[in-house]
A protein has these predicted regions:
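Short, conserved catalytic or adaptor-binding loops enriched in Gly and charged residues
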Residues: 2-8
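Acetyl-CoA-dependent GNAT
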Residues: 9-84, 88, 93-94, 106-107, ...
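C-terminal "cap" of GNAT-fold acetyltransferases
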Residues: 18-19, 26, 119-122, 126-140, ...
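Conserved G/P- and acidic residue-centered "switch" motifs that form tight phosphate/ATP-binding loops
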Residues: 69, 100, 117
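Active-site acidic-Proline motif in GNAT/NAT acetyltransferases
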Residues: 93-95, 99, 127
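Residues forming the Rossmann-fold NAD(P)(H) cofactor-binding site
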Residues: 99, 103, 107
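Conserved GNAT acetyl-CoA-binding A-motif
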Residues: 106, 112-125
């Protein structure tokens, strides 16, 4: 399987092993920001897991964004056998905010989830993350009843997605062969 890269000038978004040093940097920065922004702090040990083994194929994946070679953001997927996928660990470095990177990461996660057969994406977030809540709403996520017992969550969202094949095509549309277009 060829991994998709979501690249534009100066910013590269790629599937990355969560044990990679750049991935570790992003995840540490994500946890530190949550600890600073949440009223009662943040302890990753109390949160619903997204362990390294859950963030590598086929269980899931971690996307890491770099800007000019430096860590700029991350986002993860946890895949479930019933067609659900969870978005986890969405973070954009302070110096990369305002560039649309959060939306790019979210769109890339949606693309990756659809390519892996997901039919619905879910996520939860904390009320202190107003910019994330606005992003999710503007991207078509709708607020739903709590679907887990995440102690740090105040908002739960979901969005249906159409599964695609690994190349980004609708799996329900048969491919056209080159000979079919000849007359």
């Amino acid at each position: 399987m060829t991994e998709r890269r979501h690249t534009t000038p100066a910013i590269d978004v790629a599937v990355t092993d969560p044990r990679d040093p750049v991935a570790r940097h992003c995840l540490r920065a994500y946890f530190a920001e949550l600890a600073a922004r949440f009223a009662g702090g943040f302890d990753p040990g109390r949160s619903i897991s997204a362990d390294d083994d859950e963030l590598v194929p086929p269980a899931g994946l971690l996307l890491v964004a770099t800007r000019h070679g430096e860590p700029a953001g991350c986002g993860a997927l946890k895949l479930h056998a019933d067609g659900r996928a969870e978005i986890k660990r969405m973070w954009v470095a302070p110096g990369a905010r305002g560039l649309g990177l959060g939306r790019r990461l979210l769109t890339a996660l949606e693309t990756e989830a659809a390519a892996r057969g997901a039919t619905v994406l879910r996520l939860e977030t904390n009320r202190a993350l107003g910019e994330a809540i606005r992003l999710y709403r503007s991207a078509g996520y709708r607020e739903v009843a709590a679907f887990n017992d995440e102690p740090y969550a105040h908002h739960w969202f979901e969005k249906p997605v159409e599964p695609t094949d690994r190349e980004g095509n609708d799996p329900w549309t048969p491919p056209t062969s080159p000979s079919a277009s000849r007359t």
